[in-house]
């Protein structure tokens, strides 16, 4: 007899990984739209929390030392050279008045929040949960 109770089947499609990839696509598209505008529309602003030690994160060593696990940046009024690609985004932000270039892979992002519309996303903290080879459909 087959066990058809919830959770008894093996997920060969990997829906959880597909969902994580789709949610990262929402983040990517939101950032890409703002980078094309070269300014934040309306009252929108973003809080982006990311894992500072994850492979591919590029930022000043003193910031990694100050934030050894996670860091939250605010993208609102003062940012420069904001560029978004398929797998990461780059931005210049000022820390204590000094411009700092940052490159952050989407896989390193753990939380995204736009308080102007009370919209937020939380991603798996385990990067291995992100699907490798799962195609991401971009507009």
Segments the model singles out, each with a brief description of its role:
Residues 1-86:
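N-terminal leader/targeting segments and the first structural element of proteins
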Residues 15, 45-46, 79, 112-114, ...:
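Aromatic-enriched hydrophobic runs in primary sequence
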Residues 45, 49, 53, 93, ...:
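Charge-rich, low-complexity amphipathic helices
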Residues 61-124:
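Compact, basic/aliphatic-enriched, mixed alpha/beta core segments that act as assembly/interaction modules
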Residues 121-139:
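Intrinsically disordered, low-complexity terminal tails
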């Amino acid at each position: 007899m087959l066990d058809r109770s919830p959770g008894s089947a093996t997920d060969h499609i990997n829906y959880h990984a597909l969902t994580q990839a789709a949610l990262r696509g929402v983040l990517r598209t939101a950032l890409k739209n703002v980078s094309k505008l070269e300014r934040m529309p309306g009252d929108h602003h973003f809080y982006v929390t990311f894992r500072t030690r994850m492979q591919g994160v590029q930022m000043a060593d003193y910031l990694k030392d100050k934030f050894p696990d996670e860091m939250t940046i605010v993208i609102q009024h003062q940012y420069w050279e904001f560029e978004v690609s398929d797998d990461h985004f780059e931005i210049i932000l000022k820390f204590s008045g000094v411009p700092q270039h940052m490159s952050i892979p989407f896989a390193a992002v753990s939380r995204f929040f736009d308080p102007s519309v009370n919209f937020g996303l939380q991603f798996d903290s385990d990067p291995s949960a992100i699907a490798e080879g799962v195609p991401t459909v971009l507009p």
